């Protein structure tokens, strides 16, 4: 497959409380592609999408999500950082409450160390 769009977290750089990478990506994607097209796409993320991002993915109509580390593991990295007040609500549970069969793959233990290093650099600035 092809990489159609890429997005980083813009919460700090744009002072946007909903500027998580996945939500921001879905805003871009929904402006550029049809819902039918997006249903056949896969969103890849280093970490499991939070509840807000899972909602954006759901309403944006992406059919598959793949992530490296769980939201619980991300919480272990961020601790009580006010930038990441997270829910204990896996994206699978968010999607299960909806009407779409969004496929989810992750976490992947074989990439955990690499993903953790990326996030450590971000959260420990």
Where would I find each of the regions flagged by the language model?
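A short acidic/small-residue loop/turn micro-motif
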Residues: 10-13
């Amino acid at each position: 497959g092809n990489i159609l769009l890429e997005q980083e977290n813009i919460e700090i750089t744009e002072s946007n409380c909903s500027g998580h990478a996945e939500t921001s990506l879905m805003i871009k994607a929904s402006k550029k592609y049809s819902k039918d097209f997006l249903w056949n796409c896969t969103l890849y993320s280093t970490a499991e999408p939070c509840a807000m991002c899972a909602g954006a993915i759901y309403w944006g109509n992406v059919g598959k999500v793949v992530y490296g580390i769980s939201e619980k593991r991300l919480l272990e990295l961020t601790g009580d950082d006010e930038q990441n007040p997270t829910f204990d609500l896996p994206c699978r549970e968010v999607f299960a409450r909806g009407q779409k069969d969004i496929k989810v793959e992750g976490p992947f233990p074989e990439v955990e160390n690499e993903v953790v290093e990326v996030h450590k650099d971000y959260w420990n600035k």
